[in-house]
Design a protein with these regions (language model features):
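Conserved single-residue anchors adjacent to enzymatic active/cofactor-binding motifs
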Residues: 1-111
């Protein structure tokens, strides 16, 4: 399941938006294909891919990974627990941002 988006301004919240978009897309996919998420048999879902084409004025690298986990903030209690043991979020989403401004990703732009 591919999700492509064009951005003319840098937005670090793209992974949050991607989470919302993918939740809606997967919900529709599950309904359309009459998949039973309550079954004891595992369902198969298409592999997600989230690409952002960036052409804003802020200087950005040719390729940048934006992660949903970068948006998570721990409470004071969790911060103490984090020091005691490594605490990883149970949810992750990665968006690949490709800079398509002139002089960037030239091979991609030739296609």
């Amino acid at each position: 399941m591919n999700l492509y988006e064009h951005q003319s301004s840098y937005n670090p919240n793209m992974p949050v938006r991607g989470l919302i978009y993918f939740a809606e897309l997967y919900s529709g996919y599950i309904q359309k294909n009459k998949l039973d998420v309550y079954s004891t048999k595992q369902i198969n879902l298409p592999v997600p891919r989230y690409i952002i084409f960036y052409n804003g004025t802020k200087n950005e690298p040719e390729k940048k990974e934006l992660r949903l986990s970068e948006c998570f903030k721990y409470s004071a209690q969790q911060s103490d627990e984090l020091e005691q043991k490594e605490m990883k979020p149970c949810l992750e989403l990665t968006a690949t941002m490709l800079n398509i401004n002139i002089g960037n990703n030239e091979e991609l732009m030739k296609k």
